[in-house]
Amino acid sequence: MDFIRTLHGDISKEELGFTYSHEHIVCRPAYWQERGEDDLLLDDKEKSKRDVLDFKQHGGRSIVDATAVDYGRDVQAVQEIAIETGIHIVGTAGFNKSFLWDAKIKEELKPLTGDYASYAQWIEAKSINELADFVIREVEEGLEGTPFKAGQVKFGTGYNRITPLEEKTLRAVARAHHETKAPIHSHTEVGTMALEQIDLLKSEGVELSYLSLGHMDRNPDPYYHEQIASTGAYMSFDGIGKIKYAPESSRISLILELVRKGYEDQILISGDTARKTYYKHYDHGLGLEYIISKWVPRFVDEANRCGFDGRKLVEKFFVSNPASCFSFKK
């Protein structure tokens, strides 16, 4: 029977409800911490929790926290937020992109990773299968030595390139997926290298209906999006609210173009809210409430004007598609 794995246990697909598919809730990325980039440190549990409560008060039910081991997870804090707010939170095993790996591994992780100074040294030293075993344990036993298990496995690649170490983690994540049946999520830098990621996953025998590709709206190319969608993978439009990259009209146009081509069952929506200045209760940003309270009504209006049923599409993007995408299909 299919199920969703959250930080507080496995639930049925029907329990997931309205879902943001790619967020960050509490994290202290070592790479940014070492460089004094305070805006990228979501380091106050109570402030993060207040934003999660805003999301809940507007009808939100679940959040996928896409924070991997190399991005400074605080598993305990995020699990406590899930319990205290009543929101389902899906945790993430695996890895991010390689430029983050110059950072030092925190001491409390070394019993799990080994005594390596940096993430790059660890990943280089281990075999693909050893890295896969690490990811499998995060899904089946718990994240970072806690009893709280990951509900998806993740890898990442860089801008217009895939380094040898990134390919190594991709293959490790693919093998962990085969062992656990966990859904796979990928970081694409500025929406690039998705097709190359897909080719590598296919070489590992991955069925692409298990895959969601992040940051698709950062590369606003309808032809490229159609090529990706035709593989059967899910596409995450997770830059909602980030007008510095593109206006909302651009994202909505890209999404509706995929709907016109018949790919509405493969679209996921979120905000990738990973800075203090994006959060309402850290620094007066739009906050986690923005998509559900402001963007959704606008999308419904634009979709209806274009001849679609906007409400039906919202139900797909935020409820039925996440329930399918993030399922363990046993």
Regions found by a protein language model. Give the residues of each.
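Active-site gating/metal-coordination segments in enzymes
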Residues: 80-84, 88-90, 94-180, 234, ...
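Active-site gating loops and adjacent loop-to-helix segments of metal-dependent hydrolytic enzymes
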Residues: 23-46, 97-128, 271-296
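Glycine-enriched alpha-helix->loop->beta-strand junction motifs that scaffold or abut catalytic
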Residues: 86-87, 180-183, 202-210, 227-236, ...
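Alpha-helical scaffold segments that flank or form the walls of functional sites
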Residues: 17-26, 34-88, 128-148
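Divalent metal-coordination and catalytic microenvironments
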Residues: 22, 63, 177, 235, ...
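Short acidic/histidine-rich active-site segments
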Residues: 184-185, 237-240, 263-285
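Mid-to-C-terminal alpha-helical segments outside catalytic/metal-binding sites
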Residues: 2-9, 290-330
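Histidine/acidic-residue-rich catalytic or RNA/ligand-binding cores of hydrolases
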Residues: 29-33, 75, 101-103, 193-200, ...
